[in-house]
Amino acid sequence: MGYEPDPDALRWGLHDLEVCTLTNAGSCSSVTRYESGGGGTQGYVREGYNQPVTGYVDNDAVIAQFYQDELSRVARAEASGINSLSPTSVVAQDWPHPHQGQENQGEAIDITQESDILHNHNGNMEDKNVARIRFEGGQSSPSRDDDSVCSVEIEEESWSEVGKRLNQMIPIAHVPKINGELPSEDEQISDHERLFQRLQLYGLVENKIEGDGNCQFRSLSDQLYRSPEHHNFVREQVVNQLAYNREIYEGYVPMAYNDYLKAMKRNGEWGDHVTLQAAADLFGVRMFVITSFKDTCYIEILPHFQKSNRLICLSFWAEVHYNSIYPEGELPIPEGKKKKKYWVF
């Protein structure tokens, strides 16, 4: 079976992530899969690590040169009309709009539904060796007003080079958790330097997000709407996703679920990997989170049902801060700095 490269993955250079060799403390590429246990609501996580492959280059300079050559090749392909994807077309998705109305959430609705075996959109069982973040459970929220329902059209799935490489990963058992303890000051400094080097290696830059406790939701807002200012709307939508589909997420929250929802409603409450999964499920998009972990270069989060081929890309300074990331030269222009448009008479 042939695979067409995912245009977004090429644009981001994500098809090269497997060769990241910034640390010798383990593999630099990891994805985690949440699988259903026997009870329907409980689950466990399997995390995969890339094994060393003989013949891959070790030298960071060589890797960086390879990446630059790849970018040049993609640019030539785009110039010749092979790839018609433009930054405008990437942004032009039919996401829920921040101005749309939303019903009062109220108490979380308890929907009882047994988990099914994971299938892809063609109905085929997925490769168990591909470790991906995905919670089991119900399919969608109860019927609500049309304005509050995601209207992103489901597109034909296109597996990227990253997806093909992830098939070679060997999963290991792992326990899901929400935010952990903050690292020490020294660890924070070294983690930040490691994250910076990884972003620099792959030609990615951070859109610096305000550190007010809303950084995850601001980063998601920036990726979805090209502005971090719609973070309250994104938080509201994510909390609704968690509330209306509690059977999917409750097993991964080590506290009373209603207390967790009340906390997540509050402005300034830190998001975690449960809210990231809920956001991926809500918008139906894949997420790539470049991390500062020693043994994990990136995490891929897959939605329960993919509705778009678009990628959401974040950086995660582990347990400290999220930023929105872009390829060099593609940072969105802040609202106040956009060029004025004049009518020509």
UniProtKB/Swiss-Prot annotation:
The active site is at residues 212, 215, 321. Residues 204-328 form the OTU domain. The keyword rRNA-binding does not apply. Its EC number is 3.4.19.12. It holds the Pfam family OTU. It catalyses: Thiol-dependent hydrolysis of ester, thioester, amide, peptide and isopeptide bonds formed by the C-terminal Gly of ubiquitin (a 76-residue protein attached to proteins as an intracellular targeting signal). InterPro entries: OTU_dom, Papain-like_cys_pep_sf, Peptidase_C85-like. Hydrolase that can remove conjugated ubiquitin from proteins in vitro and may therefore play an important regulatory role at the level of protein turnover by preventing degradation. Cysteine protease with a preference for 'Lys-63' and 'Lys-48' -linked ubiquitin (UB) tetramers as substrates. Also cleaves RUB-GST fusion. This is OVARIAN TUMOR DOMAIN-containing deubiquitinating enzyme 9. It comes from Arabidopsis thaliana.
